[in-house]
């Protein structure tokens, strides 16, 4: 009997020890899983932060050119998968701060940064929530507006001109008058006979940049947009870009002019 009792007690002790070991093992596994999940969450958060930082301009917190290129590449892939592929759709606006080099040279880089930040804020406030505002580089910005008709695009460009140039920008060196030049176009461009002319998004950016150059060449503090293009095909469009001024003079390209605040 004594031996049997001892065996039972020993079995109980072994059972308790095994149970304790199992509980300890489960606790260790739970802690390990929790730590792994926390590490994975930190890794995911860090990756998201790095991705966001790589796609944002640190000064203005706008999208940067890299983000815009990624968005356009994805849209191009989506278009290529569709049967009704007729190229880039949407409106583009290129915005350049007038005489920005003078701001840096005469008032310093702190004033220049203040101007960049405030102009970015005014652009963002003047567009729709669905529009993508990009710091394109230096003092230049790009706005991509999906599904925006040409008439509404002109209204938006006028709103941005007046927002930027309407009131001085406060800087560490005091208030500065700032104006901008804008080039804008809605795509696809209408060809002769009403047919839509297919363009890749990079070509669309070139057209917006071309009318921005026109706005700057004609005096700045203004917007120039494309109202109509007389071109039967893509080859004619390419030829127009080679001599844009001549195409405007002979009315192959008809422009819309917006004047900024006096």
For the regions a language model picked out, list residue spans one by one:
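A short pre-motif secondary-structure segment
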Residues: 125, 132-135, 176
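Hydrophobic framework residues that shape the active-site pocket
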Residues: 96, 100, 119, 133-136, ...
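Cyclic nucleotide signaling catalytic output domains
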Residues: 133, 181-218, 224-250
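Conserved nucleotide-binding and Mg2+-coordinating catalytic segments in signaling enzymes
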Residues: 50-70, 95-109, 117
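Signal-transducing coiled-coil linker helices
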Residues: 1, 9-58, 66-78
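Alpha-helical scaffold within the catalytic cores of cyclic-nucleotide enzymes
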Residues: 120-124, 152-170, 205-209
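Active-site-proximal structural segments of metal-dependent nucleotidyl cyclase/transferase enzymes
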Residues: 71-107, 123, 134, 258
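Short regulatory alpha-helical coupling segments
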Residues: 49-53, 65-88, 120-128, 146
């Amino acid at each position: 009997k004594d031996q049997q009792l001892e065996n039972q007690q020993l079995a109980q002790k072994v059972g308790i020890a095994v149970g304790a070991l199992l509980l300890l093992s489960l606790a260790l596994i739970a802690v390990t899983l929790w730590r792994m999940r926390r590490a994975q969450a930190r890794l995911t958060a860090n990756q998201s932060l790095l991705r966001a930082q790589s796609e944002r301009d640190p000064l203005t917190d706008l999208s940067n050119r890299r983000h815009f290129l990624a968005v356009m590449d994805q849209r191009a892939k989506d278009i290529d998968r569709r049967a009704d592929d007729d190229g880039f759709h949407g409106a583009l606006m290129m915005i350049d701060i007038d005489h920005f080099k003078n701001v840096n040279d005469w008032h310093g880089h702190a004033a220049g940064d203040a101007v960049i930040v405030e102009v970015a804020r005014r652009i963002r406030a003047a567009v729709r929530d669905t529009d993508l505002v990009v710091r394109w580089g230096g003092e230049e910005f790009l706005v991509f507006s999906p599904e925006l008709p040409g008439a509404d695009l002109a209204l938006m460009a006028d709103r941005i001109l007046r927002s930027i140039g309407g009131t001085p920008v406060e800087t560490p060196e005091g208030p500065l008058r700032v104006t901008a030049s804008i080039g804008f176009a809605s795509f696809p461009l209408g060809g002769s006979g009403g047919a839509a002319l297919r363009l890749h998004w990079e070509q669309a950016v070139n057209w917006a940049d071309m009318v921005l150059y026109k706005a700057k060449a004609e005096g700045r503090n203004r917007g120039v947009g494309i109202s109509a293009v007389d071109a039967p095909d893509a080859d004619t469009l390419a030829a127009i870009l080679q001599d844009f001024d001549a195409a405007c003079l002979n009315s192959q390209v008809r422009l819309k002019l917006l004047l900024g605040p006096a």
